[in-house]
């Protein structure tokens, strides 16, 4: 009997030590391919998303803007960025996606140009896809989608639709999608999240910030979001604990080296958003 009690005592102590350690006690985290996997393939493209999925990501991150025909276009910028797209035009005004139809947008090659930031990125002719094309090409995809909505209050009606119209476009293009339940709507602009929440109160929302004062910014939201996405450079144990105490998740962007990934996930970071899902592994 004494042996059995002693065994139970030792087992309990061992279990307590193991589960209280930073690594054994942390919850499972997720890895997301940033704009697909732009470290190795042109960003925000159908093939880029497929490559990220091949690398085994838990989810993919993409960005959306709106074109002249009120369609969602997958693009990080609201204009054709000449730093990675091939065009003779140099002014953003003439390359404003909000004033271009889809054929004009997709006539421009956004994959063949050398990108200094990503020297190993495959150079191949690519186009900016619509969200409708994404839904069709990845219809069987069942992972998470970090759906970043690009917006800027100072550029509304010039580069972006007004918030109410923007929210309705997003609602119409996503609500019947097979991916809908896996979408996390994200933005740096609290206004578009508030507008979306009015018509999709049961969806998941993530507030994005690159500011340590993100808590103050979040007070402008009319609801409690599912979580926050923060520049990894300002994430600390204190910030992770603060977010977790609110029963929210915290994702870090953009983490491209294993050292930072391991360090932050050992603190309890819930998600790693990376350009290199071929390198950053669990």
Question: Can you say where each PLM-predicted feature lies in the sequence?
Answer:
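Phosphate-group recognition and catalysis centered on beta-loop-alpha active-site segments
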Residues: 22-282
């Amino acid at each position: 009997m004494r042996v059995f009690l002693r065994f139970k005592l030792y087992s309990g102590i061992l279990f307590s030590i193991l589960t209280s350690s930073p690594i054994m006690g942390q919850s499972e985290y997720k890895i997301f391919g940033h704009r697909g996997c732009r470290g190795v393939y042109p960003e925000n493209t159908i093939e880029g998303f497929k490559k990220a999925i091949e690398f085994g990501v838990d989810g993919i991150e993409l960005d959306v803007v709106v074109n002249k025909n009120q369609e969602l276009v997958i693009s990080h910028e609201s204009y054709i960025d000449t730093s990675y797209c091939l065009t003779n035009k140099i002014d953003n005004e003439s390359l404003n996606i909000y004033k271009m139809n889809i054929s004009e947008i997709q006539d421009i090659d956004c994959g063949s140009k050398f990108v200094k930031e990503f020297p190993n990125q495959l150079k191949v002719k690519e186009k900016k896809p619509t969200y409708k094309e994404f839904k069709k090409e990845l219809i069987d995809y069942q992972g998470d989608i970090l759906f970043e909505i690009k917006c800027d209050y100072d550029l509304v009606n010039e580069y972006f639709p007004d918030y109410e119209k923007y929210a309705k476009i997003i609602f119409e293009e996503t609500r019947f999608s097979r991916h809908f339940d896996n979408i996390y709507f994200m933005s740096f602009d609290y206004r578009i999240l508030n507008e979306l929440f009015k018509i999709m109160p049961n969806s998941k929302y993530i507030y994005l910030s690159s500011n340590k004062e993100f808590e103050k910014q979040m007070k402008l939201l009319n609801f409690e979001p599912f979580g926050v996405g923060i520049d990894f450079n300002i994430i600390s144990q204190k910030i992770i604990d603060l977010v977790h105490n609110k029963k929210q998740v915290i994702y870090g962007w953009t983490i491209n080296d294993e050292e930072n990934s391991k360090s932050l996930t050992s603190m309890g970071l819930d998600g790693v958003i990376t350009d290199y899902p071929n390198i950053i592994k669990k």
